[in-house]
């Protein structure tokens, strides 16, 4: 008797790394139940679209992805941040099978079961121990918590994903250990607010190996640093206790890299954003961090054109950047988000002014980035290889996260492998990237 073909699911994952982890968890569950992944919508039994709802532009991208899936397949399940407020999706595509918000894995699976029941053979082991991942084999996102207790005026993430809910330390460490055992060389620690990790658990201890570990930012970072992989910290708010992790970076336990979303520097704008406003103290802290860990790389994001931002505020930001010397910077033009308190603020900025300020900010940062990178010429850096070409390999230094930061382009006398970590001599630098030669393996 011929066995029925396994049902096939096409999957679209939009938005941030936190959403990508949600997608990985859903796909892992589906594969465990015997579902296969389809490369095309039209060859699948149904399509799952994991949406982003943070900005209106992201919502439009999500709606377009749903529309493409409806046109190509017709059987579509929608999940993710935009699904937390389903009215817009229902109005545009009343024929979708199901709409759920973020992290609602069981609801997504139930919708899949209703549309196309599984044909799982319990004798088959369909899922590797570390689960299914959508990133390359050599790096993985490690999500340590969900939600956020902050109430920034421009953000609706707490409305979409709720307040902070941290995973226990042993749960995070078990996942990290499995990833490293499966060949992951770099763990990218993510959440909505990484440095607040464990606050909701009151820093509860959990057993790990022959000891107990607190659910606390510094303790978790220290334990992750013992696993033998690069550990990169993202979405770190500059709370006072963040100073403690700089020592781990100086010791080489975790990468000398901090992704801190400062968003602005002007105290007046930060107050309107409902963000911490002591940026003069932040500059002092950055100087101390770099004194304690000279190799520290800082990444941050900034919003220009926020309601009420004056030319004086913007100039303050430019001057602050000159002094802070942020290594890697992402800039966004303020965009109203449905449901965000900032929509009601007076003195909204015109699109022309937003664009002009964004251009000036990026031009200033280009100069800063080039200056920072030029200092690395002649040094030796460890590089993790992401891509291998016929003559040049592309990788990243400890100062570069995948997708969002710069690259290092290397020539080598012998073939390189993706995921390999090599030592390179840096020969030259441009505004955002480095170029060098492999000097050791």
Swiss-Prot record:
GO BP annotations listed: tRNA modification
Task: Tell me the ranges covered by the Radical SAM core domain, including all copies.
Answer: 134-371
Q: Which residues form the MTTase N-terminal domain?
A: 7-117
> Required co-factor?
[4Fe-4S] cluster
The alphabetical list of record keywords is: 4Fe-4S, Cytoplasm, Iron, Iron-sulfur, Metal-binding, S-adenosyl-L-methionine, Transferase
Kindly indicate whether the keyword Calcium belongs to this entry. Answer: no
Q: Which GO terms describe its molecular function?
A: 4 iron, 4 sulfur cluster binding; aspartic acid methylthiotransferase activity; metal ion binding; protein methylthiotransferase activity
What's this chain's function? Catalyzes the methylthiolation of an aspartic acid residue of ribosomal protein uS12.
Q: What is this protein called?
A: Ribosomal protein uS12 methylthiotransferase RimO
Task: Give the organism the record lists.
Answer: Rhodopseudomonas palustris (strain BisB5)
Name of the encoding gene: rimO
């Amino acid at each position: 008797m011929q066995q029925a073909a396994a049902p096939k699911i096409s999957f679209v994952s939009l938005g941030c790394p936190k959403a990508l982890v949600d997608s990985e968890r859903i796909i892992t569950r589906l594969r465990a139940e015997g579902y296969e992944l389809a490369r095309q919508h039209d060859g699948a039994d149904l399509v799952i679209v994991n949406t982003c709802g943070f900005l209106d532009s992201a919502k439009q991208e999500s709606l377009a992805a749903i529309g493409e899936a409806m046109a190509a397949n017709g059987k579509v399940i929608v999940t993710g941040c935009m699904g937390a407020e389903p009215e817009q999706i229902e109005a545009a595509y009343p024929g979708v099978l199901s709409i759920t918000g973020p992290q609602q894995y069981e609801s997504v699976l139930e919708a899949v079961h209703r549309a196309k029941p599984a044909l799982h053979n319990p004798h088959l082991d369909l899922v590797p121990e570390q689960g299914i991942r959508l990133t390359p084999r050599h790096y993985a996102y490690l999500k340590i918590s969900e939600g956020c207790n902050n109430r920034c005026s421009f953000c609706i993430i707490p409305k979409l994903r709720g307040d902070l809910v941290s995973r226990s330390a042993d749960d995070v460490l078990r996942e990290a250990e499995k990833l490293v055992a499966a060949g992951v060389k770099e763990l990218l620690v993510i959440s909505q607010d990484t440095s607040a990790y464990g606050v909701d658990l009151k820093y509860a201890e959990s057993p790990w190996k022959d000891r107990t570990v607190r659910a606390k930012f510094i303790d978790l970072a220290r334990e992750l640093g013992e696993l033998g992989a690069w550990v990169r910290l993202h979405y770190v708010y500059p709370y006072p206790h963040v100073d403690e992790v700089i020592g781990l970076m100086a010791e080489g336990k975790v990468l000398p890299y901090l992704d801190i979303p400062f968003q602005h520097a002007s105290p007046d704008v930060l107050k309107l954003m409902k963000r911490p406003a002591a940026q003069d103290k932040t500059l002092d802290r950055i100087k101390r961090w770099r004194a304690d860990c000279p190799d520290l790389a800082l990444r941050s994001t900034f919003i220009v054109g926020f309601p009420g931002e004056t030319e004086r505020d913007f100039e303050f930001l430019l001057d602050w950047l000159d002094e802070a010397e942020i290594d890697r910077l992402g800039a966004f033009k303020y965009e109203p988000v449905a449901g965000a308190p900032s929509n009601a603020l007076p003195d909204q900025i015109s699109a022309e002014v937003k664009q002009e300020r964004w251009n000036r900010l990026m031009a200033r940062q280009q100069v800063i980035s080039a200056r920072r990178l030029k200092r690395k010429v002649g040094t030796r850096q460890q590089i993790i290889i992401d891509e291998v070409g016929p003559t040049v390999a592309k990788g990243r230094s400890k100062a570069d996260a995948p997708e969002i930061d710069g690259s290092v382009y290397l020539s080598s006398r012998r073939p390189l492998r993706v995921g390999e970590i090599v030592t390179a001599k840096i020969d030259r630098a441009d505004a955002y990237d480095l170029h060098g030669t492999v000097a050791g393996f």
